[in-house]
């Protein structure tokens, strides 16, 4: 992998999961530890990260900004266009699950005025949904490390009380072998459970996430009903069971 691509992958992981250790980065990127350390020195030199006491995290700007704000700024136009298209798959009167991802959070403005009920495991997502006047249930459970999301067995027990018509979620990436992947195990058990029990599943994924590899596999992409993206993937990249929806980005 070219050096600059690897550096960007490190920054992408830190945007989603921070702080993290160099060893975890090495595992997630399938790259030797000495190479990771060289990359971290380069990113530190560029003042893009802070590497201290074995932990790596994104360098903070002088203004106060949440990790969610950082992630929302990445591929913002693509995420907004994808969200608009995904919202059209939601039926009036349905119960919808939206995960804690920033891509899924772009759905919220598109849902205003719809007669739906939304479940979410994202604390910030729940607050934004309620502020938009949408009937919302915020699931309880253990707080995922380095995330404003809850997950775990207690969260799954709560989900079992609901009939979920549509699941809308995102992920760190899609591997070349067609697996939905993530560097953190935190929310995977909840996503896997809902994917098996929802009526319709919709994955929101911009083109920057194709061809990613990471430590944990969530599920085969072919288990998803719809992939909504800003670029048409090859059949090898996206063996989706039903349909790929490609949206133009203004």
Predicted regions and their residues:
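Glycine- and other small-residue-rich loops at beta-strand/loop junctions that grip anionic moieties
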Residues: 75, 96, 118, 148, ...
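Internal active-site segments that recognize and position negatively charged phosphoryl groups
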Residues: 105
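HTH-adjacent hinge/linker in prokaryotic transcriptional regulators
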Residues: 2-23, 27-100, 108-113, 117, ...
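Conserved phosphate- and dinucleotide-binding cores of soluble alpha/beta proteins
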Residues: 2-5, 9-12, 19-23, 30-32, ...
